[in-house]
């Protein structure tokens, strides 16, 4: 099994996905252990002084003015974890919790938090044992980090609360730790706070959303090309010289992807004799512009994610010169904004996919295709209701595009009077990405059926299109014919898209797509 080494200088998106989704093991580097030990010496020295230091010898938030004596400091650290583990609602997904834990370990290992090496090692041990703390949907305002979600994870390190074992069974955390030979941690000065104070939940969800959206944007370039072909549209609008004079990078990439898919097609430009078209509809003609703008947004979000992955988010932080300073780096605004931006572009991508699907099904706009791509229209309804499902998904995505980060509710007696709502932005983006895969799948299913109907008329689809049709049919999504139970076909198309098999089906013909 792949092992991810956690050092002092952050991590990569690829490592987050490897740990969160694929169960990669984690290991602390020697440099990380050294940095942890050095920072802990600084915290211990400060703890021995009479002056109050936030997070070391004071209360938290609005209670920071209370100086805590040495005899109560271990209790203080336990109490912050217990009291802040106040999440409610459904459990969040295992991969989200694993990303959250791994990213907190990444920050702890930087040597800027003052956590002891043995606590960091326990964090790694819990991940490697496949133990997943029970974390709830609601509880984070995305400022002072994802406090409640991280608190539930810290509670597991203490042997308290509930967690899911590698077999999927939820048990008391103490039992699971004992079963895997892991001793619960006894928190000391600053450690409880350091385990809670980060943007790790929203960042982990951003990283995984980007991985999914990269696949979906390439998939949507393919389905746009298939729809253009099925509608007998022109591929002249994809010419490189047209996109060079408006040089948005993503636009050129999407146009190139579509051109590669359509190479060798006998359908493009094959207009009806009685209704020649000078221009195709916007949803067909402007696909590179819309898809490409979304691609550029992904690149911007990835830039923000990369910076955050290289960051050490805590408050206070331990600096190399020995100072321990309060700061505002826990504010989730940078991550929250791009999470909301991605929800907007995902909604618009879903919208343009649905518009092309509707055009394929409308006999007045499909240029010779049967109504709803039905076998015997009237007796058969064809894909009529598949578009209803797609429209319902698009409608929800438009609601999910409303920014969470534009909201802020003051908390902690107005000490924390502006928050990012980044966790909420991340949660709704996960739903949006999930919906987008289904929307792309419906367009794929409709476009491949339409292409098969064109082929039955004697027209020759592009080799890449033929490869997609063959692969999708082999995956269990059947082709044209009388009405049948449609949900299994749509589910097969959905899985085909999500697993990257659509992209994999065309690349042997087109070469690698971006």
Curated annotation (Swiss-Prot):
Keywords per UniProt: Cytoplasm, Histidine metabolism, Lyase
Disulfide bonds: none
InterPro entries: Aromatic_Lyase, Fumarase/histidase_N, HutH, L-Aspartase-like, Phe/His_NH3-lyase_AS
Post-translational modification: Contains an active site 4-methylidene-imidazol-5-one (MIO), which is formed autocatalytically by cyclization and dehydration of residues Cys-Ser-Gly.
The protein's Enzyme Commission number: 4.3.1.3
Highest taxon listed in the record's lineage: Bacteria
Pathway the protein acts in: Amino-acid degradation; L-histidine degradation into L-glutamate; N-formimidoyl-L-glutamate from L-histidine: step 1/3
Principal localisation: cytoplasm
Any Gene Ontology CC annotation: cytoplasm
Example of a GO biological process term: L-histidine catabolic process to glutamate and formamide
Cross-link for 5-imidazolinone (Cys-Gly), residue positions: 143-145
Gene3D superfamilies: Fumarase/aspartase (Central domain), Fumarase/aspartase (N-terminal domain)
GO terms assigned for molecular function: histidine ammonia-lyase activity
Claim: Manganese is one of the keywords in the record: no
Subcellular location as annotated: Cytoplasm
Record-listed 2,3-didehydroalanine (Ser) modification sites: 144
Regulation: induction: By histidine.
Reaction catalysis annotation: L-histidine = trans-urocanate + NH4(+)
Family designation: Belongs to the PAL/histidase family.
Family matches, as NCBIfam families: hutH, PRK09367.1
UniProt protein name: Histidine ammonia-lyase
């Amino acid at each position: 099994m792949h092992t991810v080494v956690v050092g002092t200088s952050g991590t990569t998106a690829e490592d987050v996905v490897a740990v969160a989704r694929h169960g990669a093991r984690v290991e602390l580097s020697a440099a990380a252990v050294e940095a942890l030990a050095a920072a802990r010496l600084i915290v211990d020295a400060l703890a021995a002084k009479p002056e109050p230091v936030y997070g070391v010898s004071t209360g938290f938030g609005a209670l920071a003015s209370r100086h805590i004596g040495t005899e109560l400091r271990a209790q203080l650290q336990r109490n912050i974890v217990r009291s802040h583990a106040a999440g409610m609602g459904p459990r969040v997904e295992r991969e989200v919790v694993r990303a959250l834990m791994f990213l907190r370990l990444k920050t702890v290992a930087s040597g800027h938090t003052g956590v002891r090496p043995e606590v960091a090692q326990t964090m790694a041990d819990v991940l490697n044992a496949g133990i997943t703390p029970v974390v709830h949907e609601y509880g984070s305002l995305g400022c002072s980090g994802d406090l409640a979600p991280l608190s539930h994870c810290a509670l597991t390190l203490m042997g308290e609360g509930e967690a899911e074992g590698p077999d999927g069974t939820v048990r008391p955390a103490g039992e699971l730790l004992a079963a895997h030979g892991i001793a619960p941690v006894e928190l000391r000065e600053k450690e409880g706070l350091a385990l809670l104070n980060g943007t790790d939940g929203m960042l982990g969800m951003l990283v995984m959303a980007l991985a999914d959206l990269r696949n979906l944007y390439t998939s949507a370039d393919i389905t746009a090309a298939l729809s253009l072909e099925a509608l007998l549209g022109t591929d002249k609008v994809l010419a490189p010289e047209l996109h060079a004079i408006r040089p948005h990078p993503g636009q050129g990439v999407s146009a190139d992807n579509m051109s590669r898919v359509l190479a060798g097609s006998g359908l493009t430009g094959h207009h009806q004799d009685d209704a020649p078209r000078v221009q195709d509809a916007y949803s067909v003609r402007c696909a590179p512009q819309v898809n490409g703008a979304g691609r550029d947004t992904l690149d911007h979000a990835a830039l923000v994610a990369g910076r955050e992955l290289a960051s050490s988010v805590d408050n206070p932080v331990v600096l190399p010169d020995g100072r321990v300073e309060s700061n505002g780096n826990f504010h989730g605004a940078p991550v929250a904004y791009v999470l909301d931006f991605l929800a907007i572009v995902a909604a618009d991508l879903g919208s343009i996919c649905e518009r092309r699907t509707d055009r394929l099904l409308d006999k007045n706009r499909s240029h010779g295709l049967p109504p709803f791509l039905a076998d015997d229209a009237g007796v058969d309804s064809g894909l009529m209701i598949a578009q209803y499902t797609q429209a319902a998904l698009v409608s929800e995505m438009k609601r999910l595009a409303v920014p969470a980060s534009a909201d802020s509710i003051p908390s902690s007696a107005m000490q924390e009077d502006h928050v990012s709502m980044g966790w909420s932005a991340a949660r709704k983006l996960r739903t949006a990405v999930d919906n987008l895969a289904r929307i792309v799948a419906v367009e794929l299913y409709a476009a491949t059926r339409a292409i098969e109907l064109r082929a039955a008329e004697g027209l020759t689809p592009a080799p890449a299109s033929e490869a997609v049709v063959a692969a999708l049919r082999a995956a269990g999504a059947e082709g044209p014919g009388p009405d049948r139970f449609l949900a299994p076909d749509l589910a097969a198309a959905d899985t085909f898209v999500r697993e990257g098999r659509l992209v994999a089906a065309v690349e042997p013909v087109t070469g690698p797509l971006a």
